[in-house]
Amino acid sequence: MLSATATPDVISDVKQAIGLDNVTVVSDQFDRPNLKFEVHEKSKESAKEIISILSSGESGLVYCSTKRECEETSALLEAAGISSQAYHAEISKTVKESLQQQWSLGTIKILCCTSAFGMAINKPNVRVVFFHSLPASLEELFQGWGRAGRDGQPAFCYLYFSYSDRIFHIRNISDQANYDAEARTTAVKRFQKVMEFVLISSCRRIFLLSYFNPQEANLTSCNNCDICELRPFTSIPQSVDFTVKVQQIVDSIQQVVDKPFTIKYLAQVVSGKNNKKIKENGHDTLPAFGILKCTTKKCELFLMYILTKDILREVSPPRGSANSSFLQVSLGSQYMQYVTGQTKLMYQSL
């Protein structure tokens, strides 16, 4: 078996599945020091930033979640004078082969593609790989980024995302008819790791190495990611024990099971917003009301971090139901660990 992104847990599962205990595992290093990692929340300036980066004329890939995103992104690049084409599952085999060849030869500089592209492709001089939205897993991210800089020369790996990308992935997991409960939970937890990756305030390379091969995660910093690059100019956030706050949030969620919250609404509650809707619903009397003295945006990021620990979990309401376009907050599989105090939640000071 060959894999570029097998975690220790996956390797253990494979060994168990094939029923062989005496298996030799040969692994190369995961760390690719020539790759620089950057993660950015999308803003009004993101399109200009992406165009500026890709206008160098170097070979690159832009990974997108959907056919529409591929086509719209490619059109945006073409309009800016950048040689680009869209590549996705719905184009014919003949066209796919033609696009692969043109991109490999350098006739096309940028392919805007879904994960349908990339298998068995080995182009050494790819200088930049973008993810234009959140991937479904760190495996998908690392596989895509890993196509950059295979010649050993410096290359750049970017993830541009919106927090609303969560809706696409959670709904997609919910809609998978061939998933049983275990497969659905596994998919959710893999996506939670992606969310944790974008939310961290520590070295991104160390985080990825800790996930894929902990034996390599013995760095203090990599000096080649956006976090480490800013470290000399920013103070290291102090970690604070938020376990009691988490317990109050869980208590509040348990009290409103008949009318689930969204993360945005819950952020308003915990930040103490005294608006009409919160008052009418009586949510200004919940244990979590006003427990965090910071902006609603910071509260929302804190709640998203709680999601990555599976204390809370976002679920997709049935299609066609009221508010079916929003994700609802429910309790995750780990909430009791924090309610009983067996596990503490440490988070940067707000």
Label every model-predicted segment.
Residues 1-181, 189, 217-218:
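Helicase motor core with emphasis on the C-terminal RecA-like subdomain
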